């Protein structure tokens, strides 16, 4: 056998045609990784890079519209959940990349690595509360349509420290959401990255 009984459609599914081919495969689709499909945004980026906690109302509305479309696709295909990346604070991306590079080079004891580790939380903290508030607003806006469609919303463990939510913010977000519809979606690879880069303990 396959060793598993279902698949997740991830954001590499860039067109309705790709999604249909996957849906016609031998295994059912259990979940969809927002946005599905993942077209090119008029903003000149992949739609998965649109920020669901953006303070730019036009970008936010575009991102929410795609998430609503993913809910509709999940309901149509009989998938039980969609997985959400809630977005990011638009600072710290270069520093996060530097941390990854230094870790892969085995330089986690270097001054450069330690300085970068300290710098990201400091920069992030300046605007994280506004972005977290927007992320909560996003989930609350998606909750009604998801409930009506019989689809769950999973807020995924983040990969980089500049992203929303971190583990403490996740707890705050979930406290503001309907637990019958919204839950925590654990990505073991993302959590392991956080532990290895020294952000948190993967337990």
Regions found by a protein language model. Give the residues of each.
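Short, acidic/polar
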Residues: 1, 15-18, 62-73, 135, ...
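Catalytic domains of carbohydrate-active enzymes, especially glycoside hydrolases
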Residues: 1-15, 76-81
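Acidic-and-aromatic substrate-binding clefts and catalytic sites of carbohydrate-active enzymes
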Residues: 6-20, 39-40, 90-92, 160-166, ...
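Alpha/beta catalytic barrel-like cores
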Residues: 12, 45-54
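Aromatic-lined substrate-binding rim segments of carbohydrate-active enzymes
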Residues: 16-33
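Short, hinge-like loop/turn segments at secondary-structure boundaries
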Residues: 23-26, 48-50, 100-101, 171-173, ...
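Non-cysteine beta-strand/loop elements that form the S-adenosyl-L-methionine
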Residues: 29-39, 84, 184-187, 203
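Active-site acidic/histidine proton-transfer and metal-coordination neighborhood
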Residues: 52-186
């Amino acid at each position: 056998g396959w060793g598993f009984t279902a698949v997740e459609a991830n954001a590499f599914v860039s067109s309705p045609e790709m999604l249909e081919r996957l849906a016609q495969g031998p295994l059912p689709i259990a979940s969809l990784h927002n946005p599905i499909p993942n077209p090119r945004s008029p903003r000149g980026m992949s739609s998965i890079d649109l920020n669901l906690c953006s303070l730019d109302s036009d970008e936010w509305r575009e991102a929410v519209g795609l998430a609503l479309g993913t809910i509709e696709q999940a309901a149509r295909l009989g998938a039980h959940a969609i997985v959400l990346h809630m977005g990011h604070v638009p600072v710290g991306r270069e520093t996060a990349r530097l941390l990854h590079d230094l870790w892969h080079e085995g330089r986690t004891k270097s001054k450069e690595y330690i300085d970068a580790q300290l710098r990201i939380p400091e920069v992030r903290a300046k605007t994280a509360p506004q972005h977290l508030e927007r992320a909560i607003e996003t989930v609350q806006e998606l909750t009604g349509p998801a409930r009506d469609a019989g689809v769950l919303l999973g807020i995924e463990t983040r990969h980089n420290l500049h992203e929303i939510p971190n583990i403490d913010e996740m707890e705050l977000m979930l406290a503001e959401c309907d637990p019958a519809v919204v839950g925590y979606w654990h990505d073991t690879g993302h959590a392991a990255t956080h532990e290895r880069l020294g952000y948190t303990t993967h337990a």
